[in-house]
Swiss-Prot record:
Lineage summary: Eukaryota, Metazoa, Chordata, Craniata, Vertebrata
Chain's gene name: mff-a
GO molecular function, one term: protein homodimerization activity
Topological domain ranges for the Extracellular compartment: 218-219
GO biological process: mitochondrial fission; positive regulation of mitochondrial fission; protein targeting to mitochondrion
Protein name: Mitochondrial fission factor homolog A
Topological region Cytoplasmic: 1-199
TM segment ranges: 200-217
Location(s), subcellular: Mitochondrion outer membrane; Peroxisome; Cytoplasmic vesicle, Secretory vesicle, Synaptic vesicle
Protein family (similarity comment): Belongs to the Tango11 family.
Organism listed in the record: Xenopus laevis (African clawed frog)
Entry GO terms, CC: mitochondrial outer membrane; peroxisome; synaptic vesicle
Length: 219
């Protein structure tokens, strides 16, 4: 919820800056004649939509016409030899147990005060809380990994069981089909035998009837 509020605040802040920001035509470090500048600013029309970039930026002491002296910071920056500056490569691994925080090196130089003791205790509490959160997070990840492994093993077992059941069902269906085929063959053979028997009986009955009719006519 706090993250959502912060994002909404940043969006509102950015929108307000974009709508209300106006870029001046000229910037100066030290103010000159305040009355003249205010009067000029009041007479100057403020652009409504178009934002214009100033033509120049004047630093105090840089121009000969400026009544202000050159700042000493610029002299220090210009007089510094770039060759004396060097960049130190940071270490690849940062271990909190060996060097917890940089401000702990100053404990021996600064005298112990109640505020420093309170800050130190709060730092220890934060480190303990951070380490406990890391331990809980690692334990949660291990438990999640174990549960996922158990679920994958169970899925594999269920798949194997389903395959075995499918093979058993296929074998039983094959046996039943073979039995049905044999039964059909037996029924067809019995039907053929019955047809032959009926034809023989019908032939005998017809011959006997014709013979009786001929004998009766002879009388």
């Amino acid at each position: 919820m706090a993250e959502i509020n912060r994002m909404q605040y940043e969006i509102d802040y950015t929108e307000g800056i974009s709508q209300r920001m106006r870029v001046p035509e000229m910037l100066k470090v030290a103010p000159g004649n305040l009355g003249a500048n205010l009067k000029a600013q009041q007479d100057m029309p403020i652009p409504g939509v178009v934002m214009e970039v100033p033509e120049r930026i004047v630093v105090a002491g840089q121009s000969e016409e400026s009544p202000f002296s050159r700042p000493s910071d610029l002299d220090f920056i210009s007089g510094t030899n770039i060759g004396t500056l060097a960049l130190k490569t940071p270490p690849r691994v940062l271990t909190l147990s060996e060097r917890p925080l940089d401000f702990l090196d100053l404990e021996g130089l600064t005298p112990a005060t109640p505020q420093s003791e309170e800050i130190r205790s709060s730092g220890h509490l934060k480190r303990d809380k951070f380490s406990s959160e890391n331990a809980l997070r690692q334990n949660g990840q291990l438990v999640r990994h174990d549960s996922m492994s158990a679920m994958s093993t169970l899925d594999t077992t269920l798949d194997a069981t389903a395959d075995d059941l499918a093979l058993a069902d296929a074998a039983s269906l094959r046996r039943q089909i073979i039995k049905l085929n044999r039964r059909l063959l037996l029924l067809e053979e019995e039907n053929k035998e019955r047809v032959k028997h009926e034809m023989t009986m019908y032939s005998i009955i017809i011959i006997f009837g014709l013979l009786n009719s001929w004998l009766w006519l002879r009388r």
